[in-house]
Amino acid sequence: LTSYHAFVERQITASAYLQVLVDEKPYTEDDISKYYDDNADSYAGNGIEKSDVKMVNVRHILIQPEGKNDDGTYTDEAWAEAEKKANDLLTEWQNGEHTEDSFAFMAAENSQDPGSVENGGLYEDIYPGKMVDEFDAWCFDPARQPGDTGIVKTSYGYHIMYFSSTGEHAYWYVRAEEDYLNELSVSVLQEVAAKFEVTESEQNAAIVD
């Protein structure tokens, strides 16, 4: 057990040291843009297009219809009731403090989306195409501003929307930056490893000058 703890400590120390070395190699947004361009075919093949549209952060409260037809679709009455509840909740919020915090509280109390209810309805770093079309269209309306609200109907139900903020970068940039840094880490690790000779015996492995 002692040797295992020592191994873990060495791994943590080595990882931290590698990160320090990587951090010492500055890069610019132009470097990331060039990295994307150099690998554009690969990114495009994965549906990651270069775009000026930045990622966004949005809160929502999902109100699902309750009541289905024999074919499994929601009844008209169920849709109408869900729409009314969504409008009533939005009006209640507008007549109250109408802050992002109060919206988050309302989401935690009312949203039927298990993926965001515990986080006040928040979805961060949404990029075009991540959500269903109607949700997506509302989020990326060019006129959208922080604090905007609205109601959107999707196949899941009615979404009471709150636009929180626009992110710093577009999705392609974040993905390219992540890949760039991963490659940089590998390159730095190889540079460090090349400075040392490793003994062939795994049992007596050691690093020597």
Identify the residue ranges that each predicted region occupies:
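PPIase-associated folding chaperone regions across multiple families
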Residues: 1-81, 108, 128-209
